[in-house]
C-alpha cells in the first residue's frame, strides 16, 4: 500500500511538471486562475513594482487576488496570516524549529491551521510546481537554481513572483520606507489596505515622535550583530535596522559583512543589539557576551547588550514597529 501511494504521488508530480513545462502550460494555468476567481473585486487589476531574481526592477500585474500562494520565511508568512490569507497558502517554507514558528502557531491558530503545507526551510522547484501556485512571495536568494529557479521561469508560466527588496541586499541601502512599501504592496495585492494603512500610519507616527524627542541628543555608536560560533555577522547601515538606528540618533561604525572578536572589542560601541533566531541562539549569544574577553567593552560594563529576535531587524514587515521600539528602548532606556 505504501509503495502504491508513493507511485501515485510520483505519477501526479510528473503530470504537473508536464503541465508546467509544456508549451501550453501557461494557458492552462491562466484557465485555472480564471476558474477560481469568478466575480473578482473591482479593486483589480493591481500593478506592483518588484524585482526579478537578478535584482533588476520589474513590473507585475494582478488581475485578481492570488488564490494559491507559496511563501518563504516567517515575517512574509505572518504578513499573509494577518491579512487573512491562510486558506490561500498552499506552501510555506520556514525554520519549523525556531521560536518564531511556535509563536505564529500560538498567535494565529485558526489562520495558521488553514495553511496547506508547512515545509522545513526550503522548497525546491519540483516541489513548488507540484503545489500549483499562482503567486510566489520570497527572498531573492530563494529564486536560485537549486530552489525555485529564476523568476522569469515562473513568469513565463503565468505565475507572479515578488522578491522582498529588503532581504539579500537587493537594495544597497534599505530603509524603513522600503519596508513600508512591502507592507503597502501586500495590502494592495490582497485588497487589505485598511489593515496595512493603519500599520503604516503607526510606523510613521512613531518615527516622527521619536525623531523629535531624540533631536539634539549626543549620537551613539551602535552595533547590530548575530553570533553563531564562527564569524560575527554585522548588520551595517545598508539594512533596515541600520536606518532605524540612524533615525533614532545612532550610527553603525562598521561596514563589513562579518567582523572578528578583535574588531568588535576595538570598535567598543555604546550599545550592542544581538539578534537571534531561536532560544538556542539567544542562549548562545548571552553566553558569548559573558566571555571575559569582552569585559573591557562599554556596552558590557554598562549593561547595554540587548538580545532581540532577528525578525525585528531583518525584513521585519509587520514587526517593523516592534523593531523600532526595541531599538529605542536599548538606546534610550530611561525614556
Predicted regions and their residues:
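Bacterial Sec-exported substrate-binding components of ABC uptake systems
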Residues: 2-79, 188-224, 268, 276, ...
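Structured C-terminal subdomain patch of bacterial secreted/periplasmic proteins
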Residues: 27, 173-188, 193, 197, ...
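Short, solvent-exposed loop/turn elements at domain surfaces
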Residues: 56-60, 77-82, 98-103, 230-236, ...
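Extracytoplasmic/secreted envelope proteins and their assembly/folding machinery
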Residues: 63-66, 73-78, 125, 129, ...
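Structural recognition of the beta-strand scaffold that forms the well-ordered cores
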Residues: 70-72, 90-93, 135-139, 161-165, ...
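A short, structured surface patch at a secondary-structure boundary
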Residues: 70-131, 135, 139-141, 253
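Extracytoplasmic ligand-binding site segments that recognize negatively charged/polar headgroups
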Residues: 98-100, 140-151, 159-185, 218-240
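Alpha-helical, coiled-coil/dimerization segments enriched in small aliphatic residues
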Residues: 233-260
Amino acid at each position: 500500500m505504501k509503495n502504491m501511494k508513493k507511485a501515485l504521488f510520483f505519477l501526479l508530480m510528473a503530470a504537473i511538471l508536464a503541465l508546467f513545462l509544456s508549451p501550453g502550460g501557461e494557458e492552462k494555468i491562466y484557465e485555472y486562475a480564471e476558474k477560481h476567481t469568478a466575480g473578482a473585486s473591482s479593486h483589480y487589476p493591481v500593478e506592483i513594482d518588484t524585482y526579478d531574481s537578478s535584482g533588476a526592477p520589474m513590473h507585475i500585474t494582478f488581475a485578481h487576488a492570488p488564490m494559491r500562494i507559496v511563501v518563504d520565511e516567517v515575517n512574509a508568512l505572518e504578513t499573509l496570516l494577518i491579512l487573512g490569507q491562510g486558506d490561500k497558502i498552499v506552501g510555506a517554507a520556514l525554520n519549523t524549529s525556531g521560536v518564531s514558528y511556535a509563536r505564529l502557531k500560538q498567535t494565529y491558530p485558526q489562520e495558521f491551521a488553514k495553511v496547506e503545507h508547512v515545509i522545513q526551510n526550503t522548497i525546491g522547484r519540483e516541489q513548488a510546481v507540484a503545489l500549483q501556485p499562482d503567486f510566489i512571495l520570497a527572498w531573492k536568494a530563494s529564486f536560485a537554481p537549486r530552489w525555485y529557479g529564476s523568476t522569469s521561469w515562473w513568469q513565463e508560466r503565468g505565475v507572479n513572483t515578488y522578491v522582498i527588496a529588503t532581504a539579500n541586499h537587493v537594495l544597497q541601502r534599505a530603509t524603513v520606507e522600503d519596508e513600508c512599501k512591502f507592507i503597502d504592496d501586500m495590502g494592495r495585492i490582497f485588497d487589505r489596505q485598511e489593515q496595512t494603512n493603519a500599520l503604516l500610519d503607526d510606523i510613521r507616527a512613531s518615527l516622527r515622535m521619536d525623531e523629535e524627542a531624540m533631536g539634539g541628543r549626543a549620537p551613539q555608536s551602535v552595533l547590530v550583530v548575530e553570533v553563531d560560533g564562527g564569524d560575527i555577522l554585522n548588520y551595517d547601515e545598508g539594512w533596515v535596522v541600520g536606518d532605524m538606528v540612524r533615525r533614532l540618533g545612532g550610527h553603525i561604525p562598521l561596514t563589513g559583512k562579518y567582523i572578528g572578536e578583535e574588531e568588535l572589542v576595538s570598535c567598543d560601541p555604546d550599545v550592542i543589539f544581538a539578534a537571534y533566531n531561536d532560544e538556542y541562539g539567544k542562549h548562545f549569544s548571552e553566553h558569548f557576551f559573558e566571555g571575559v574577553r569582552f569585559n573591557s567593552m562599554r556596552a558590557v560594563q554598562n549593561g547595554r547588550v540587548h538580545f532581540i529576535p532577528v525578525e525585528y531587524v531583518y525584513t521585519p514587515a509587520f514587526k517593523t514597529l516592534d523593531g523600532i521600539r526595541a531599538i529605542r528602548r536599548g538606546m534610550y532606556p530611561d525614556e
